[in-house]
From Swiss-Prot:
Keywords: Plastid, Ribonucleoprotein, Ribosomal protein. It is found in: Plastid. This is Small ribosomal subunit protein uS2c. Belongs to the universal ribosomal protein uS2 family. One of its GO terms (cellular component) is ribonucleoprotein complex. Its main location: plastid. It comes from the Eukaryota. Coiled coil: none annotated.
Length: 11
């Protein structure tokens, strides 16, 4: 799950 919603890959 990376660029699906926001910067969820960074959270």
């Amino acid at each position: 799950m990376t660029r699906r919603y926001w910067n969820i890959d960074l959270e």
